[in-house]
C-alpha cells in the first residue's frame, strides 16, 4: 500500500488558478481517509487557500494533507491550524539580484507586455515568478 500520494494542483486537481470542484474535493477527502496526500504547485500559499482549502472542511482529516507551495520550497501541515514547517526564502540581496537580472533580460529581449493581470514579476518569498 502506498503511504503518500503527491499531486500537482494546476491542471491536475483543478484547472489553472481555479478552485477544486465539488467532485474533486469529495474525492480528495475520501483519499485522505486512506492515505497521506501532498499537493505541490508553483503558486504561493494564498493560492492554495483560495483553490483548495476553502473547498475542504477544516477538520482532523487535514492532518493527513501536506501543502507544498512555490514548487516545494515551502511546506505546510495541519495540526488544528495550518503551520509553516519550512520556507527556503531568498535573502533581500538574492531577490534584488534576481529581479534586476530578469528586468535586464526582458529589456535586452525587447519584450513588452501590453496588459498584465497583477505584477509581471512576483516575489513569492522562496520563488521569484515572471508571468
What residue spans do the PLM features occupy?
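A generic structural motif
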Residues: 126-131
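Active-site phosphate-binding/coordination module
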Residues: 19-120
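Asp-based phosphoryl-transfer active-site loop
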Residues: 2-19, 39, 67
